[in-house]
Amino acid sequence: MASSTPSSSATSSNAGADPNTTNLRPTTYDTWCGVAHGCTRKLGLKICGFLQRTNSLEEKSRLVSAFKERQSSKNLLSCENSDRDGRFRRTETDFSNLFARDLLPAKNGEEQTVQFLLEVVDILLNYVRKTFDRSTKVLDFHHPHQLLEGMEGFNLELSDHPESLEQILVDCRDTLKYGVRTGHPRFFNQLSTGLDIIGLAGEWLTSTANTNMFTYEIAPVFVLMEQITLKKMREIVGWSSKDGDGIFSPGGAISNMYSIMAARYKFFPEVKTKGMAAVPKLVLFTSEHSHYSIKKAGAALGFGTDNVILIKCNERGKIIPADLEAKILEAKQKGYVPLYVNATAGTTVYGAFDPIQEIADICEKYNLWLHVDAAWGGGLLMSRKHRHKLSGIERANSVTWNPHKMMGVLLQCSAILVKEKGILQGCNQMCAGYLFQPDKQYDVSYDTGDKAIQCGRHVDIFKFWLMWKAKGTVGFENQINKCLELAEYLYAKIKNREEFEMVFDGEPEHTNVCFWYIPQSLRGIPDSPERREKLHRVAPKIKALMMESGTTMVGYQPQGDKANFFRMVISNPAATQSDIDFLIEEIERLGQDL
């Protein structure tokens, strides 16, 4: 057999390595151990035990020295248990004859529980390690019918009878195997990417606590964390630290819905009891490039999508203030009552920032509620270099800000911030007596759940709070600046190349870089309907080839009458210039013969 392929650590530093290669001949004990742990648990443990027994003293000495130099997270990936608490050493356990009923709180279930969770942690750590290894695929793509039919012992169907813990461990491993590694440095498909280790630890602890956010009574620490963090976010927006309110919601779409509910309640509080029949014909305004959640909220809240009026944008995707004012006047002339304007700070496709100052002037002139949807762009408020792009946000009545996007907090983590205290409570509270008793022994103003439209509410704050503690505001600033610099690097690399064409002129405001790849067959051909039709098919074909090969992922879409183009977004702090270079080369490789 030929000499062994480089280890994963070597290949990860080699930008030219084939991402589909597999290390077939590990040359050291620890790499063999990694292979063993990829086997079915019973077999893997036997192999690992054999390796430990047969390893030479010299090799063991080398390994112990090497392990001490590793980070603690990597220590956990090895099988060197000499320094661990004896209660948490892995033993050879036959999970094929164990079931969920054998775990805690079962009598004498502690040992089985420890061994099972150690196996789960091993699966998770192996996944984390591979996520940051560029020789690992971003995804192992299969069509829906293939996964539904079952893959090598991985079956999605539910059974009437319990399955063994061995099968459960296989299911855990294969669920990750057939998913998408959204934390991979070459995953650019969505606005939410990355795998922050501190955030991951926070999410694990959150699930272990398994509590609810509706009262201080059952989530005292988390409720206080949320209040402190929301106050800090409001201060960064530019509001007074004494006033204001906010809450974490399941996502930006719900945060935007909160803003419309708050605006409606502010001007027409009777709507809470009497409904939409008691108020005038209200209309909302948002840009034609804004997130679809504004129209969705209009439908859900009884305004109707016809009463969500779209404002024209310029070629960069920014609201044209003159068109906003003209449409407000037109609506008033038709007997409608303008209520609310949504300005976007970081549009989904172009990454555009609406001119908030000019929009705020119009809202003040006509007494309208101004909301800023900064779900994507809010993170730039953390950067002294880039926060000017949101100039005027302090004049807004409400702001949506998603830390799970640009700030890299694990999903889900979205905040709705409101400038005026008390509106969320007044709008949503129902005073359920079994939760929100007024005569508790503590200050019940900390029972924040009644200002939410939900009852049960997931703890989204801890991972974010923990990341902020670990990074500091400066750490988030550096992370965001780096992502913006990578977008500038990509733009500079492709803007003058004949095989690429920019969707709009000028440097990107955000990390969104929008471009067409022009295959050889379409270069030098004048614009025409036929050329646009052919170009429209290029991005989907390249994306399909990307997914089949699993090397990288980047999104595409049309916009208005424009043919499908690639929308590159960067929010993963693990990405580097070499990953941008790889993306460019991969698009060229996959698209050159189209």
Curated annotation (Swiss-Prot):
<keyword id="KW-0456">Lyase</keyword>
<dbReference type="InterPro" id="IPR015421">
    <property type="entry name" value="PyrdxlP-dep_Trfase_major"/>
</dbReference>
<feature type="compositionally biased region" description="Low complexity">
    <location>
        <begin position="1"/>
        <end position="13"/>
    </location>
</feature>
<dbReference type="GO" id="GO:0009449">
    <property type="term" value="P:gamma-aminobutyric acid biosynthetic process"/>
</dbReference>
<feature type="region of interest" description="Disordered">
    <location>
        <begin position="1"/>
        <end position="23"/>
    </location>
</feature>
<dbReference type="GO" id="GO:0005737">
    <property type="term" value="C:cytoplasm"/>
</dbReference>
<keyword id="KW-0663">Pyridoxal phosphate</keyword>
<dbReference type="InterPro" id="IPR015424">
    <property type="entry name" value="PyrdxlP-dep_Trfase"/>
</dbReference>
<dbReference type="GO" id="GO:0048786">
    <property type="term" value="C:presynaptic active zone"/>
</dbReference>
<feature type="binding site">
    <location>
        <begin position="190"/>
        <end position="192"/>
    </location>
    <ligand>
        <name>4-aminobutanoate</name>
    </ligand>
</feature>
<dbReference type="GO" id="GO:0042802">
    <property type="term" value="F:identical protein binding"/>
</dbReference>
<feature type="binding site">
    <location>
        <position position="567"/>
    </location>
    <ligand>
        <name>4-aminobutanoate</name>
    </ligand>
</feature>
<dbReference type="InterPro" id="IPR021115">
    <property type="entry name" value="Pyridoxal-P_BS"/>
</dbReference>
<comment type="function">
    <text>Catalyzes the synthesis of the inhibitory neurotransmitter gamma-aminobutyric acid (GABA) with pyridoxal 5'-phosphate as cofactor.</text>
</comment>
<feature type="modified residue" description="N6-(pyridoxal phosphate)lysine">
    <location>
        <position position="405"/>
    </location>
</feature>
<dbReference type="Pfam" id="PF00282">
    <property type="entry name" value="Pyridoxal_deC"/>
</dbReference>
<dbReference type="InterPro" id="IPR002129">
    <property type="entry name" value="PyrdxlP-dep_de-COase"/>
</dbReference>
<comment type="subunit">
    <text>Homodimer.</text>
</comment>
<protein>
    <recommendedName>
        <fullName>Glutamate decarboxylase 1</fullName>
        <ecNumber>4.1.1.15</ecNumber>
    </recommendedName>
</protein>
<dbReference type="GO" id="GO:0030170">
    <property type="term" value="F:pyridoxal phosphate binding"/>
</dbReference>
<keyword id="KW-0530">Neurotransmitter biosynthesis</keyword>
<dbReference type="GO" id="GO:0004351">
    <property type="term" value="F:glutamate decarboxylase activity"/>
</dbReference>
<feature type="modified residue" description="Phosphoserine">
    <location>
        <position position="78"/>
    </location>
</feature>
<comment type="similarity">
    <text>Belongs to the group II decarboxylase family.</text>
</comment>
<dbReference type="GO" id="GO:0006538">
    <property type="term" value="P:glutamate catabolic process"/>
</dbReference>
<keyword id="KW-0597">Phosphoprotein</keyword>
<keyword id="KW-0210">Decarboxylase</keyword>
